[in-house]
Amino acid sequence: MTNFKNYLEAKVNIRGNKNLNYLSSFFSETELAILSNKTISIVGTNGKSSTANNIAMLLKGLDKSYIAFTSPHLFDYKERMTAHKDLNFNEYIQYLENFELKNNINLGYFESTFLIAAKAFLHNDMDYFICEAGIGGKYDTTSVIQSKTVVLTSIGLDHTDILGNKITDILNQKINVSDNIETLFVSVLNKELIEIIKSQYTNYSQSIYLSEYLISKNILFSNLIFKELN
């Protein structure tokens, strides 16, 4: 059996595969439906990982089962995939290897860790998949989930070569991580962006929660999310 650490080390210099149709086909329709219902997708310029970790901490306190997928890691790849219990990710490598062979593609590091985390979540029948987006949202690898629950932490001028030069362009890129949003949590943003969210996204969002808390106090933001979801 291939060791997950060795598998990932071989991916370090491989360019990521952004063909979302390919990546989506890694999952069955049933699996995608489960992911859509049970995933908390987190997008934003700053505060994504800390928000994800705070939500995970709150879930663990109530004995809820979860996997939190975040990036990047500081010391060890396992930091990207934390769960309420110890998991052996080695047993899921075969899924990736078969997928790459079948489609004649090489997955990048980010794609590999994301797909493994999602597969482990599905196979362990967990309550929540907390999923931090990589860059942007609309064309991000994690958008294959089409989550019904999306969290927007903050908006700033990042990756403008990919996401656009205007704050409004970046906002649209990030929120459109899913076209299937039913519940949207938004941390403090400027008035213009709040008005855009209220006017443009109420058509497909059943509930929009605007937090009064700054992202620097995102434990409070995370508590708001946690309260509404439970």
Q: What is the predicted role of each segment?
A:
Residues 1-44, 53, 57-64:
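Short functional linear segments
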Residues 56-61, 119, 123, 199, ...:
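Short, well-ordered alpha-helices that flank and scaffold nucleotide-derived cofactor binding pockets
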Residues 20, 24-35, 61-145, 157, ...:
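ATP-dependent carboxylate-amine ligase catalytic core
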Residues 9, 60, 97-100, 198-203:
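Class I S-adenosyl-L-methionine
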Residues 124-132, 147-230:
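Acidic, Mg2+-coordinating active-site environments of NTP-dependent enzymes
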Residues 53-57, 115, 223:
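Short, hydrophobic alpha-helix immediately C-terminal to the catalytic nucleophile
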